[in-house]
Amino acid sequence: MEFGSTEDGRHDKFPVGMRVLAVDDNPTCLRKLEELLLRCKYHVTKTMESRKALEMLRENSNMFDLVISDVEMPDTDGFKLLEIGLEMDLPVIMLSAHSDYDSVMKGIIHGACDYLVKPVGLKELQNIWHHVVKKNIKSYAKLLPPSESDSVPSASRKRKDKVNDSGDEDDSDREEDDGEGSEQDGDGSGTRKKPRVVWSQELHQKFVSAVQQLGLDKAVPKKILDLMSIEGLTRENVASHLQKYRLYLKKIDEGQQQNMTPDAFGTRDSSYFQMAQLDGLRDFTAARQIPSSGLLSRSHLTKLQPPMYSSINLQGMNSSSFIQQGHHQNSSNSANPFGTYHSTLSPRIQNVNLFQRTSSPLEPLQFPRSKSYIGDFKGLGDRAIGGSFLDTCMPFGSSSTSLPSASTNPLMLQANYTQPLHIASDGIQPCIEGTPSNSASPNISFQGLSRFPGHSWQGNLNTTRFPPSSLPLNLAFLPDQVTCAGNNLGDCTSLVSAENPGGEMQCDPQLLGGFMQNVNPLGGQKWEQQNCTMLNNPFGNIEYPLPADNMVFRDNNSTRSKGLDESLMNPIDNSQEYVGKATTMLDPEMKSGKPENDNQHDVFDDIMNEMMKQEENNGMVPVATRFGFDSFPPP
């Protein structure tokens, strides 16, 4: 056992030289604790037995300033040493390896000034001196300067002076201290912040019910507070909540007004409510029947109703009278027993883009018009065979008289040829298209139309002399080997395109190669046989009544006196663009379908003369120029 020397001047360098009693039954922990205390420059007294520590305290309590004791001791409980230390008015620090809540709470309740957990750190031991100062404030106050020593609270001094031998204070002193504390609390209550009111859902429902009962205009905080009758709620709380509630209602009203304002055109002008619905086409078709000429002038536009220009609705395109401006003239033509061909407009053409036709109310509206002048069906020369068939461009379909769509019909032949077509066609070479494996009748089509889908050509012409399996593809045959259903051409119907806005039939220059690709020269015998078959016309008078001009395509059973030479045309393929010189002459008696008194200046004669001049001057005439087309596609 070691005892630190006590000196009268120990407070001069406090906490250096503070006397500490260390008690622990574990020698390792005790040695570690001693080293740390010495590093703090404390005077250390250590022991491993609690009984010896008690004897030292009882002999001279003024020998130590602080006691550090382990809780668990083998001979005596650590709390027993704590009680003795408190009797001697010494600060006691409990040391233990257990850091649980119950152990710490037990040590603090029994009077320990601090509770340290093993292993103890250096910083913790450096701050244990303030416990000594708390117990001896009067003695350690002398260490302070005179100015600071006077500022020590008087209450602490009184309490320290009136401490009796047992360490208890008088009851009167406690009452005085309680009264002073209550007065201080009362003085601070005026400056204390008021508790905040939390508006729960139930409290807000009572508030809303009170406002609805009074009315929003007459609701004031005092009346609302009386109706709510809730303790702890002040008038200021109700006033603040009422202001927030009114702002909330104002925002809701503004949001509803914004939703009701039209914003389709990026503006809030209420005048857009007065706009009519997009239903102009119904009024357009019901107001006036479109004239058959296919052209609307300004006088026609002024008679139409105004809603036509204000809006356009695609639902108004159901009426067939808006599209088919010439359908009512020749739609009732019937097939005669002599084999008259019919050409009519489709009543089901609906997919037409009308926005391009109605760009301005002051511009004349042009509607589709079928315009074709066809001359007499006579025996023509080689030039008519080479050029007139391509210029006619009459698409022959099945017996169906309607098209599903003008823009999607695969059999519709369009052209950019703007001159009236007075050229007659002759010598059309048909071909048979089909597959050998198909047991049905082969499909019959004209040359140049083979690039189009052939689903609507089925059933037009049936062959009786050739079985389907024995005919190769694109095989040329003679007209006398083909029979038509009903021994006439009454069942065959030609369709006229209503797609051209200019009113004239057009043909795509890209179709030239397709038309002329398969018009290969046959043997002299085959051409002569074909020409011979044309001498006796078995079909009688063939007419092509067109709805726009009522021009008739006739054959007056005139005989063909001129034969066709086998050198009529050279083979044309994708790499050749020239046609050989024809060897036959034109029929001088060829006339157009006009009356005799109107034949002084025939357009057909002018066209044929121009073609002869070009052939004589150039020798070899390009295909595109030969047939009346430019060598490049029109813009």
Swiss-Prot record:
Lineage of source species: Eukaryota, Viridiplantae, Streptophyta, Embryophyta, Tracheophyta
Compartment list: Nucleus
GO cellular component, one term: nucleus
Protein name stated in the entry: Two-component response regulator ARR18
Residue ranges of the annotated DNA-binding region, renumbered to this chain: 196-246
A GO biological-process term: cytokinin-activated signaling pathway
Location of 4-aspartylphosphate modifications: 70
Keywords from the named record: Activator, Cytokinin signaling pathway, DNA-binding, Nucleus, Phosphoprotein, Transcription, Transcription regulation, Two-component regulatory system
Organism: Arabidopsis thaliana (Mouse-ear cress)
Signal sequence, start to end: none
Motif (Nuclear localization signal): 193-196
Tissue specificity annotation: Predominantly expressed in young leaf tissue developing anthers, and siliques.
InterPro entries: ARR-like (IPR045279), CheY-like_superfamily (IPR011006), Homeodomain-like_sf (IPR009057), Myb_dom (IPR017930), Myb_dom_plants (IPR006447), Response_reg_B-typ_pln (IPR017053), SANT/Myb (IPR001005), Sig_transdc_resp-reg_receiver (IPR001789)
Positions of region (Disordered): 144-196, 323-342
UniProt PTM: Two-component system major event consists of a His-to-Asp phosphorelay between a sensor histidine kinase (HK) and a response regulator (RR). In plants, the His-to-Asp phosphorelay involves an additional intermediate named Histidine-containing phosphotransfer protein (HPt). This multistep phosphorelay consists of a His-Asp-His-Asp sequential transfer of a phosphate group between first a His and an Asp of the HK protein, followed by the transfer to a conserved His of the HPt protein and finally the transfer to an Asp in the receiver domain of the RR protein.
